[in-house]
Amino acid sequence: MRLGNLGAATWPLLALTLAGCVSTRPEPPPAPVTRAKTQATREASPAGDAPRALVPPGLRLDSRVKPVRQAVTLELDPRQETFRGTADIELALFADEPLRELWLHGDELTVEAATLEVNGRKVAVSALPVGEHIALVPEEPVGKGSASLHLEYTGRALANEDTGVFRAEEDGRWYAMTQFEALYARRAFPCFDEPGFKIPWQLTLRVRAEDGAYSNAPVEHEDVGADGWKTVRFKPTPPLPSYLVAFAVGPFDVVDAGRAGRNGVPVRMLVAHGHAAEATWAARVTPPLLEKLEAWFDSPYPFAKLDVLAVPGGPGGAMEHPGLITFGAQSMLGPVEGDSVWRQRMFAETQAHELAHQWFGNLVTMEWWDDLWLNESFADWLAFKVINQWQPGWRWDVRRVESRGQAMEADQLVSARSIRQPIQSSGDINGAFDGITYGKGAAVLAMFESWLGPDAFQLGVRRYLQAHARGSATTKDFFRALSIVVDRDVAPAFSTFLDQPGVPLVSVELQCPKDGPPRLALSQRRYLPLGSPGGQDGTPWQVPICARYTAGGAEGRACTVLSEPTGTLVLDGAKACPEQVHPNADGRGYYHALLAGDGLERLARQGGKGLSVPERRVLMDDAQALVASGDLDVAQALTLATKLLRPEDPDLVEAAVGVVGSVRDEFVPDALLPHRARFVRGLFGPMARRLGFVSRPGESEDLRMLRPSLVWLVANVGQDAVLRAEARKLALRWLEDRSVLSPDAASAVLGTAASGGDAALHQRLLQALRATRNERERELLIGALGAFRDPALSRASLELMLAPDVDAREALPILFNQLSEPPTRVGAFGFLREHFEPLRQRLPRDVSMWLLASGGFFCDAEHRQQAADFLGPRAEQLEGGERALAQALERVDLCIAQRKALRPGLERFLAHY
């Protein structure tokens, strides 16, 4: 699963305060669940018994009662909030002693009738709701054997939610969809809502005759009645956990994408009425990606069909349901002409991720949520590989390194999770969908794949999947399969990265003794940025380390595993003392590297000669991190970025932009802001002005992707008067004619114009917002409205979050855009304090958790305390809220410490400009 975005400009800001990825691109960290922390009880009183309290079983259901298969029939009209359903569940009872109650999940459902048959005998039963559970209390205790349960119930499909069964309206037409991962199948039907319960499902949907009905499996039978309704029965599915069940109802257009894969499965795109042409890219890329994955697994796609559905109004994200993958419409659909390059590439990456899940997660499912990494880490890791094979010109090996850096940004926190975090609450389950599980997990897999060898690693994965196909598995099962193939126990080394949080900091010092070959003296400790409350009390990692070096004009490579606090790597192949050493060959190691002595100076002197783009990118990422930890002077990091920069390489320019842009405004004294602007203009100005805001015919896709970040930095941080004036003119032209700017550039233009904009521009943007229903235009306009710095105008923009004609979800970027900028931060947080409760009520329950992130944007003790005082009591009421707030406040502490430590070095560096 990839969760949705709030707009390209917002996620980097929100990511600074959540445990997800930090990026200049829309790669969101999933949010924890928002749920009051309550433990419900209920009294039961079977005939002849005194009333007794019913206490639900907690996180995991009673293992003595297991489902065997389940059939669900739903009567669903997307125009209506209420739906009706029946659930028929075959059960196996394993109790040694008779059971007085049977438990299953059911949330916000009203059970109207229940019948139970045990070993062929009917037993009177009461069905009582208790929190997120349903207690089945039989008239008399029931023992071992087989049972069948029939439940009739009603539920709700809400229009302001995006989990469970939810509804959306577009152009007067209504659609109903589902999102059950992680804990929301229980809102659609009573069930055993845990990943380890993997059973066949058969769904039947009774819908209006004019609506289409879709689910995981192909249609078995369809019957149209004289009453204007039809009944659509789907074939039984292979064994699936409840979170992978899915269905959709509505007047969808169907785009035939042909047949794909070894079995020639039918591939279709399902889109809201009138949007078929916008699915062209999705239909084009899905079949070849499926075939690339089949080749890697040497196994056919394991399901009977492949529908890909664009959720109307959905801003982003995706879910891997077998046979019915879902995407937010903004992620999946794009105009036939003038589409965003970044949207196309991110759709392809996300689709590769979701298709990889058909094996990782769907064919073989984790036994319990603490092994979520077996789903998400593997899908992210393989998506990078497959995209790089399919489109090598995209250089997704650089994107992999970027993702690694984003994961490390989250993993530096003392409050960060480990990849395999013990699950103690439902908040822990939902909190596991974060940058640690996705990004760190993928980076760790890439590191161990490189250490063990790609071919052996691939064979180990195939062995694991073959052994557990159509079933469930654990991390131990994966380790066992991989260890057999490589003939060594991989568990100890792997576990040091899976079972503890943090990033190793490996110090590397080149030593060239006269009486032996050159060597690298290695030491490791936990990376901790300045201001961190953490200590060095963890278990040493077993770090696979590969170094690349140049000695006497010849290149060499040496590898080892650093298992102790210190170690040595002998460079046997070096015939002389190396001119340079890169401590992380190919950028595949999950560690920050500190080049001791003159190691960094050697690399800088060589200007990165002979280094690949991923290796240069890793050096820049490490330099940023070492500045934050106090191990490298900020001037050294900025100088290194200039030395490694190749103006002709957009990926390296983007990396250097990230290094320079990472210096927060709060770190720079007001008197030196003009100096910083001159430094930025001097380094990037010529490139930015040549590139401009407007795409040129024949321009490469890489330049189109670079434009927003490069030109925005020079125009705003560099205060380039020419670019700012151009942005104002182009913004006004864009308001008249959307074709004057590519989608990739429009955000930077509108944001730059708005940052210095007046009331007239604000009014024009507001009018344009209210005049369009085009989701992409609205995203751009809302992003611009969040960029105004004038207090009155920024306040007017914030009030859109409460406007009845604006969806609070789409307006939320305004809040985070303003929180990210010092001039508007205090006002934005004040607005949130005034309107926290109405905002929370207007947002979906999961999304409202993100409001806790607002406290993480400050960089001073006074406002940190205000955030803690205001948000603390609210976080206590939400599952996962305390961890989310702790991470936000920890980031404030880091910023305060780094501001104090880095200012002197910045002052010295910027004084020269």
Predicted regions: what they are:
Residues A9-G20:
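Bacterial N-terminal signal peptides
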Residues C21-R84, D171-Y175, P195, A491:
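N-terminal, polar/Ser/Thr-rich
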Residues R25-Q39, F234, R262-P533, S662, ...:
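Hydrophobic alpha-helical and helix-loop surface patches within well-folded domains
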Residues D88-E108, Q202-R208, S523-C546:
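Surface-exposed beta-strand/loop patches in extracellular or lumenal glycoproteins
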Residues L102, D107-E170, D227-G228, T566-A576:
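A surface-exposed beta-strand-loop module
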Residues E112-E117, V490-A491, P501-N584:
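Beta-strand-rich binding/interaction modules
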Residues H150-D256, A279-W281, Y591, V613-D621:
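Extended, low-hydrophobicity, Ser/Thr/Pro/Gly-biased non-transmembrane segments
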Residues R404-G405, A521, G535, T550, ...:
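Long, ordered, helix-rich scaffold segments
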